[in-house]
Amino acid sequence: MNFLWKGRRFLIAGILPTFEGAADEIVDKENKTYKAFLASKPPEETGLERLKQMFTIDEFGSISSELNSVYQAGFLGFLIGAIYGGVTQSRVAYMNFMENNQATAFKSHFDAKKKLQDQFTVNFAKGGFKWGWRVGLFTTSYFGIITCMSVYRGKSSIYEYLAAGSITGSLYKVSLGLRGMAAGGIIGGFLGGVAGVTSLLLMKASGTSMEEVRYWQYKWRLDRDENIQQAFKKLTEDENPELFKAHDEKTSEHVSLDTIK
């Protein structure tokens, strides 16, 4: 048992990136970026202040790392839902087209393919939109509730996942009445609890915490902004073509028309 506890990092080596050093050395406390991250947080802030800070845009026009994670989860959910809905709906459209047009006389082979392609594309778009916004709204609500509760409490636990799963499941089945909402809440709470236990176990096994995850998000944002600034700087330096640069080097001496008579 002791061997498994000491080798807990190897249990998720294929899932999470590895770090050198002990678990408490993953984030260097003397790092300038970490100090700047701590300096941006008030020393004694309430839950409402943390929640307000989450929805505040900084001076550079960037959203908070917590809100950015909710946005990424919602977009990923929309993308997965759109792909799933598009594939399933287009497959149904293909089968219906083949069954309903077995005796149809088309002008040519290309005309049949064109109509099949049109119906395939339209149904793919319909299915993608139908499932995309639903899954996107579900994942955005789920991760949004988890993040808001975690930010308000200042820590992460299983309760956020249970509450988020129950609330989201109930709202998803609101069209079925109270019984549907109750069933959706129970199923959502169960699935949310499973997801919460899995996430917390992964963080514990890797020796990380939610604060460290937010720190790395903060650091990656700084690195991204710095790379963008360097790219713009290089772009402005390369605006002059090589021909103009060569001309400027050859005519670096001051040329005047005063000597011409």
From Swiss-Prot:
InterPro entries for this protein: TIMMDC1
Keywords: Membrane, Transmembrane, Transmembrane helix
Gene Ontology CC, one term: membrane
Cell compartment(s), UniProt: Membrane
Regions that span the bilayer: 67-87, 131-151, 183-203
Signal peptide: none
Subunit structure: Associates with complex I assembly intermediates during its biogenesis in a NdufAF3 and NdufAF4 dependent manner.
UniProt function note: Chaperone protein involved in the assembly of the mitochondrial NADH:ubiquinone oxidoreductase complex (complex I). Essential for viability.
The protein's name: Complex I assembly factor TIMMDC1, mitochondrial
UniProt organism field: Drosophila melanogaster (Fruit fly)
Gene that this sequence comes from: Timmdc1
